[in-house]
Amino acid sequence: MEQTYEYAWIIPFIPLPVPMLIGAGLILFPTATKSFRRMWAFQSVLLLSIVMVFSIYLSIQQINSRSFYQYVWSWIINNDFSLEFGYLIDPLTSIMSILITTVGIMVLIYSDNYMAHDQGYLRFFAYMSFFSTSMLGLVTSSNLIQIYIFWELVGLCSYLLIGFWFTRPVAANACQKAFVTNRVGDFGLLLGILGFYWITGSFEFRNFFEIFNNLIYNNEVDFLFVTLCAVLLFAGAVAKSAQFPLHVWLPDAMEGPTPISALIHAATMVAAGIFLVARLLPLFRVIPYIMYLISVIGIITVLLGATLALAQKDIKRGLAYSTMSQLGYMMLALGMGSYRSALFHLITHAYSKALLFLGSGSIIHSMETIVGYSPAKSQNMGLMGGLRKHVPITKITFLLGTLSLCGIPPLACFWSKDEILNDSWLYSPIFAIIAWATAGLTAFYMFRIYLLTFEGHLNVHFKNYGGKQKTPFYSISLWGKNGVKKNSCLLTMNNNESTYFFSKTKYPLDKNGRKMTRPFMTIAHFEHKAVYSYPYESDNTMLFPIFVLGLFTLFVGSLGIPFNQEGGNLDILSKWLAPSINLLHQKSNNSMDWNEFLKDAVLSVSIAYFGIFIASFLYKPIYSSLKNFELINSFVKKGPKRILWDKIINGIYDWSYNRAYIDAFYTRFLVGGIRGLAEFTHFFDRRVIDGMTNGVGVISFIVGEGIKYIGGGRISSYLFLYLAYVLVFLLVYYLLFSTF
């Protein structure tokens, strides 16, 4: 086993040859490299599969031995400074490595077909492999310097992949927004690292924690300075994991290809902030108020992400806000000290959300045959509906991921979210109420996405995308609007017009929207073209990863079932995390009383089903359930209560669709303020500073010219002017200094 750990340093570098060889091939042999481009997809999958096998083997060793391994060697040594590099293999490392590799392999297989038509196919796989190297290097790092190096490389990969279609202005702006927002957190992370190095004199985790704990025990540190450094460290995690208030980049990051959203912005990169907090939890727990700050940021993000997901019309942005909310649950768990629950939810959410994103990619892929390549249309849930008949396999797997995220047993997220909800009662009743209420909101907005996408009829075939022109409560344009519209149900209505809970806005279609050429599935069928008027199911190379992730969603929750049976321990996750400490309630074993478990489970599932029921009531097409027509019609009738209810709903949806006006606030006050300062600085530099410099020259020139014309070349004039200057100088001197 010792020999196996000795070779673990190679894990981050195994995927690295792919981007290097692709780059060299495009420079030296561009034609041949492009001709055999699909070979590089195979190479990427093969190398990442090797890492996966290695990671699984190390994880088995971790579970059996309940230990960790660290190897460090000195890179620079002198009398005053030594920099050490190495790698650390512990339960947290092995969990993250398996997540990165398993989800990464599925995404790479999926991308081979999804990106087959794209001219940037090779560039895509080069970026993805380089991201795998960066992320694996991050999770195996043994000190803060290595963490920061790979942290920046991960941010670079995110920038490149979000802006993959950089010719689209929206994508270019999105990658810049993500880059700048993450730079704010990264700058804080760097300052925090330097601050703690100044305190402890070490970057390496074990020495760092030991020295710092001794300093705290002996009361030899300035708690104000230590708290500031800890907040700066936490700022890096806040930005990377899209926590409030640095969450604004994540929804715009959906401008990249959908496989990127599945791997980077759902399962791995956004989990880097959670990983950092989990890695530094022994540090944070001994600093006053930091753990409470982490939990506060987590609970705010939980609620904010869920409410902002309520009114999104873009399927990927809805899933992005869902990711933000679920990451908030993990951050809340870490702030409460529930280390096991946070990592458990990290595992289950990664597979469920990757399944949902790949499913949304399959939906978008099929919609492009009708509406064309336009993200504003192919990702618009208002143009979908009734897809269950056209993409049945995608529908089943998407429903599986939806129910998992809703917290329906026995799917994966039920087990992990239930633990966090139960632990929240031990920490704070207020936080618990918010967390449980948000669980209901999660079920509501996730089932809303499912119903708008798969139920009813294909809305793109209707003139107003609603099926019936004169049925206001049937239209499913409940998410908001593209711009400011006087008659939008999400804005204040005119006094002489009635308010409707559902929008009646009509969206025009392109004339040739229904007749599109089907993109090729494989190179062998490149010349095959067919015209489709309805969406079609994706190719097997896209369905296979979705199916595998569906299996993970079904069974991965069994890793952490929180009860034991006589004669055998079923809680594999607890054995896996045995070297770590559950800071919330340390127990000799992780068994749970069946009665307590069932009581909590019944309550959480009831809340989830209530959210599903409300979503079904509001979004399920009425013609599929005519029995409820009179009930729905009773809610549509006008009256004082109805008008008040509409105003409340319109306000909520307007607030949600406009992202709680946080982006607008940043744009107006931060971006606008910085732009105004830059313009003022430019004006001051060009007009004032340059004006003073140029003014001296101009004045000297004018004075010289004046003297030249006044003197006229006569000596008597020069003597007169000279005496006049002397007399003026003496007069000024007398007036100023005569009092002294």
Curated annotation (Swiss-Prot):
It comes from the Eukaryota. One of its GO terms (biological process) is electron transport coupled proton transport. It holds the Pfam family Proton_antipo_N. Its EC number is 7.1.1.-. Disulfide bonds: none annotated. InterPro entries: NADH_UbQ_OxRdtase_chlpt_su5_C (IPR002128), NADHpl_OxRdtase_5_subgr (IPR018393), ND/Mrp_TM (IPR001750), NU5C-like (IPR003945), Proton_antipo_N (IPR001516). It is an enzyme of class 7 (translocase). One of its GO terms (cellular component) is chloroplast thylakoid membrane. It catalyses: a plastoquinone + NADH + (n+1) H(+)(in) = a plastoquinol + NAD(+) + n H(+)(out); a plastoquinone + NADPH + (n+1) H(+)(in) = a plastoquinol + NADP(+) + n H(+)(out). Keywords: Chloroplast, Membrane, NAD, NADP, Plastid, Plastoquinone, Quinone, Thylakoid, Translocase, Transmembrane, Transmembrane helix, Transport. It is a multi-pass membrane protein. Its main location: plastid. The chain crosses the membrane at residues 9-29, 40-60, 89-109, 125-145, 147-167, 185-205, 219-239, 258-278, 286-306, 327-347, 354-374, 396-416, 425-445, 543-563, 602-622, 717-737. It is found in: Plastid, Chloroplast thylakoid membrane. One of its GO terms (molecular function) is quinone binding. NCBIfam families: NDH_I_L, PRK06590.1. PANTHER family: NADH-UBIQUINONE OXIDOREDUCTASE CHAIN 5 (PTHR42829:SF2). Belongs to the complex I subunit 5 family. NDH is composed of at least 16 different subunits, 5 of which are encoded in the nucleus. NDH shuttles electrons from NAD(P)H:plastoquinone, via FMN and iron-sulfur (Fe-S) centers, to quinones in the photosynthetic chain and possibly in a chloroplast respiratory chain. The immediate electron acceptor for the enzyme in this species is believed to be plastoquinone. Couples the redox reaction to proton translocation, and thus conserves the redox energy in a proton gradient. This is NAD(P)H-quinone oxidoreductase subunit 5, chloroplastic. It comes from Nicotiana tomentosiformis (Tobacco). The lineage of its organism: Eukaryota, Viridiplantae, Streptophyta, Embryophyta, Tracheophyta.
